Curated annotation (Swiss-Prot):
Pfam families: DXP_redisom_C, DXP_reductoisom, DXPR_C. Its EC number is 1.1.1.267. Belongs to the DXR family. This is 1-deoxy-D-xylulose 5-phosphate reductoisomerase. Keywords: Isoprene biosynthesis, Manganese, Metal-binding, NADP, Oxidoreductase. It catalyses: 2-C-methyl-D-erythritol 4-phosphate + NADP(+) = 1-deoxy-D-xylulose 5-phosphate + NADPH + H(+). Mn(2+) binds at D148, E150, E218. One of its GO terms (molecular function) is 1-deoxy-D-xylulose-5-phosphate reductoisomerase activity. Coiled coil: none annotated. Catalyzes the NADPH-dependent rearrangement and reduction of 1-deoxy-D-xylulose-5-phosphate (DXP) to 2-C-methyl-D-erythritol 4-phosphate (MEP). One of its GO terms (biological process) is isopentenyl diphosphate biosynthetic process, methylerythritol 4-phosphate pathway involved in terpenoid biosynthetic process. It comes from the Bacteria.
Length: 381
């Protein structure tokens, strides 16, 4: 029996993780759940999965939940302290970091320090603190298994000596606006941007997929997860989202991992590794399908170029880029900035940052804090 703490249990990845638990009650058990403030959803989860601890970031929401589940034997905690409580208890074996944004960095670090393995769906953790997180995991002998479909695909293809690896190829759908003119992009609304052609995801990651910032974040994540230089990480536009990623070896051989665009598959693999479990999910059928690929250079994706540049520069710059992007995306969703302003804001904040070595958590969090304040200042004008 594997016992889980699920951070971000009410979000897209979190609810799909619980679906995997639901399918495998003899192998998986929920020890703790954590979310932001969705009291109604997490109460339903509490009554079904009977966790021992629930953490909510918002204190008011935690108080309400405590009243709602008073008939259950559940400890309700709040804030970052509560979030850390869910990951540092001795009972859970694996922490699923499905929480959105840089906020996942601290609980990931604390979970590693107390000996937990990580099923990582929170790419911002490695973007902001990749060297620190991976160094901690390596030093303590802990495993970080990727949940992102692209990185799970790469992980599944890396069966040989890593010294024979030539490069990795991340695929991207290109989002809903590939090939659109600047005039068309000026009219993009949050509702339109939230209509991803292939994947069902949360709001923030869906906007990131439209701008291609999500792929930029994944490039930085891949750099840390697989210890690859940035010039060994390629991106290909693959609109059908059937091939999730590829690896190329030194002899020219290419291995690709294929599957339906269903996040439950990489989630399950991260929870069952190194074995595989059967499931009732719909299978991939390639009959009649045409698979196409395009160079992202054929389109204007400034976010992808910015992410490569920030990743190569390193230090605190990726954390600043990520923080500025989080603020800008939420401002777009709140109709405070236009779609085309998102990456411009991020670029401006990055250009103003005095980069430091990201050697400790405090330095990273300070850079993150500065970037959020500066982005808000630019939005307010």
């Amino acid at each position: 029996m594997k016992r889980l703490t699920i951070l971000g249990s009410t979000g897209s990845i979190g609810t799909q993780t619980l679906d995997i638990v639901r399918q495998n009650p003899e192998q998986l058990e929920v020890f703790a759940l954590a979310a932001g403030k969705n009291v109604q959803e997490i109460e339903l989860q509490a009554r079904e999965f009977k966790p021992r601890i629930i953490g909510l970031m918002e204190e008011k929401a935690a108080r309400e939940l405590k009243q709602r589940v008073a008939d259950l034997d559940i400890e309700v905690v709040s804030g970052m302290e509560g979030l850390l409580r869910t990951v540092t208890d001795e009972v859970p074996d694996t922490v699923v970091t499905a929480i959105s944004g840089r906020i996942g960095l601290e609980p990931t670090m604390e979970a590693l320090k107390v000996g937990k393995d990580i099923a990582l769906a929170n790419k911002e953790t490695l973007v902001a603190g990749g060297d620190l997180v991976m160094g901690t995991a390596q030093r303590l002998g802990r495993t970080i298994l990727p949940v992102d479909s692209e990185h799970s695909a790469i992980f599944q293809c890396l069966e040989e000596d890593p010294r024979t690896l030539d490069k990795i190829i991340l695929t991207a759908s290109g989002g809903p606006f590939r090939g659109w003119s600047e005039e068309q992009l000026q009219e993009v609304t949050p509702e339109r941007a939230l209509q991803h052609p292939n994947w069902a995801m949360g709001a923030k990651i869906t906007i990131d997929s439209a701008t291609m910032m999500n792929k930029g974040l994944e490039v930085i994540e891949a750099h840390h997860l697989f210890h690859m230089e940035y010039d060994q990480i390629d991106v290909l536009i693959h609109p059908q989202s059937v091939i999730h990623s590829m690896v190329q070896y030194c002899d020219g051989s290419v291995l690709a991992q294929c599957g339906r665009p269903d996040m439950r598959l990489p989630i399950q693999y991260a929870l069952t590794y190194p074995t595989r479990w059967p499931n009732p999910f719909e299978r991939l059928d390639l009959r009649g399908k045409t698979l196409t690929f395009f160079d992202p250079e054929d389109y204007d994706f400034p976010a992808l170029k910015l992410a490569y540049a920030c990743g190569k520069r390193g230090g605190t710059l990726p954390a600043v880029m990520n923080a500025a992007n989080e603020v800008a995306v939420h401002a777009f969703l709140a109709r405070r900035v236009a779609y085309l302003e998102i990456i411009g804001l991020v670029d401006k904040v990055c250009s103003e940052h005095d980069v430091l070595d990201a050697t400790d958590l405090e330095t990273i969090l300070n850079a993150d804090h500065w970037a959020r304040i500066r982005t808000e200042e630019l939005i307010h004008g």
